[in-house]
């Protein structure tokens, strides 16, 4: 069986954790999938360091080594690194890439994500809500409806992935007429660590010291 070749576009928080999850389940995935490329605007040394040392999950168990200016190895995996802003310039087709894991947060509509398809990839999985995606998948709710006709696929939001499985079961067993929900979210990279200016005065508060009401894109 020929392995499906995967590229990660955007090696921030989500991109790195997707890669770590892939490494943790290497025995399950190595026969069918290979993460071969990472595209990110940060330099390779910074990305290697951030992958190796994680404040939440700890140091990477696998050995990681830089190979030249544009490659690194993790265990038995060798990854080529690029730094392109425009997916068209990545020429995924020439690289033999089948699936893009779109983790930048920038290409969050089908129109934008299709740039990867125009570049030669076959599928795009967006790690966020995606406007007009062919399919938005939530594991445990509708994952069995995913099919090969879906080209741009959204993995939904963190809130949706938390709420939907619970609501699905409650609605199936008892029925939901209407409802109201709130989400309590850990602070993220766009929340300031100190008090500072923000057009939303609630968001101007230091993340670690305040409970900050805000909206959600879920």
Label the model's feature ranges:
Residues 211-218:
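Short, intrinsically disordered, charge-balanced linker/junction segments flanking boundaries
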């Amino acid at each position: 069986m020929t392995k499906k070749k995967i590229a990660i576009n955007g090696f921030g928080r989500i991109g790195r954790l997707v890669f770590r999850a892939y490494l943790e389940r290497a025995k399950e995935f190595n026969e069918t999938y290979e993460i071969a490329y990472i595209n990110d605007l940060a330099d390779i040394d910074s990305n290697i360091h951030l992958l190796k040392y994680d404040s939440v999950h700890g140091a990477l168990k696998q050995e990681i080594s830089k190979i030249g200016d544009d490659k690194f190895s993790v265990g038995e995996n060798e990854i080529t690194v690029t730094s392109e802003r425009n997916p068209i310039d990545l020429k995924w087709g020439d690289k033999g890439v089948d699936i893009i894991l779109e983790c930048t947060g920038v290409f969050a509509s089908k129109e934008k994500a299709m740039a990867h398809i125009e570049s030669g990839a076959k599928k795009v999985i967006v790690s966020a809500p995606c406007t007009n995606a062919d399919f938005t998948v939530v594991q445990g709710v509708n994952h069995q409806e995913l099919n090969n006709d879906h080209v741009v696929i959204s993995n939904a939001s963190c809130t949706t992935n938390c709420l939907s499985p619970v609501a699905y079961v409650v609605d199936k067993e008892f029925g939901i007429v209407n409802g109201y929900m709130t989400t309590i979210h850990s602070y993220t990279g766009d929340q300031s660590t100190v008090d500072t200016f923000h057009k939303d005065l609630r968001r101007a508060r230091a993340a670690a010291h305040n409970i900050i009401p805000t909206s959600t894109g879920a």
